[in-house]
UniProtKB/Swiss-Prot annotation:
One of its GO terms (cellular component) is cytosolic small ribosomal subunit. One of its GO terms (biological process) is translation. Belongs to the universal ribosomal protein uS15 family. It comes from Clostridium botulinum (strain Alaska E43 / Type E3). The keyword Ribonucleoprotein applies. GO terms for molecular function: rRNA binding; structural constituent of ribosome. Part of the 30S ribosomal subunit. Forms a bridge to the 50S subunit in the 70S ribosome, contacting the 23S rRNA. CDD domains: Ribosomal_S15p_S13e. It comes from the Bacteria. One of the primary rRNA binding proteins, it binds directly to 16S rRNA where it helps nucleate assembly of the platform of the 30S subunit by binding and bridging several RNA helices of the 16S rRNA. Forms an intersubunit bridge (bridge B4) with the 23S rRNA of the 50S subunit in the ribosome. Coiled coil: none annotated. This is Small ribosomal subunit protein uS15. Keywords: Ribonucleoprotein, Ribosomal protein, RNA-binding, rRNA-binding. PANTHER family: RIBOSOMAL PROTEIN S15, BACTERIAL AND ORGANELLAR, SMALL RIBOSOMAL SUBUNIT PROTEIN US15M.
Length: 87
């Protein structure tokens, strides 16, 4: 993910200008990295170090989603629908 794509995601999912810390932005950025790494692992099946990193990112995203669901269920439903996550 290059800098331009990262700024685009922050702008799309941020609650205000320059918002990088909200759960929505963090979830969207992690989803982008997860999707990228998933493609890498389809080609490089024996890259177990990257697979561990992927599993850690998925766990981190799961924690952020659980936090958002506890805090504001509508924001949670919106981000899950926008990103097309299975829940």
């Amino acid at each position: 993910m290059d800098k331009a794509r990262k700024l685009e995601i922050i702008k799309q999912y941020g609650r205000s200008e320059g918002d990088t810390g909200s759960p929505e932005v963090q979830i969207a950025l992690l989803t982008e990295r997860i999707n990228s790494l998933t493609g890498h692992l389809k080609v490089h099946k024996k890259d177990h170090h990257s697979r561990r990193g992927l599993l850690m990112m998925v766990g981190h995203r799961r924690g952020l989603l659980n936090y958002l669901a506890d805090q504001d269920i509508e924001r949670y439903r919106t981000i899950v629908k926008q990103l097309g996550l299975r829940r």
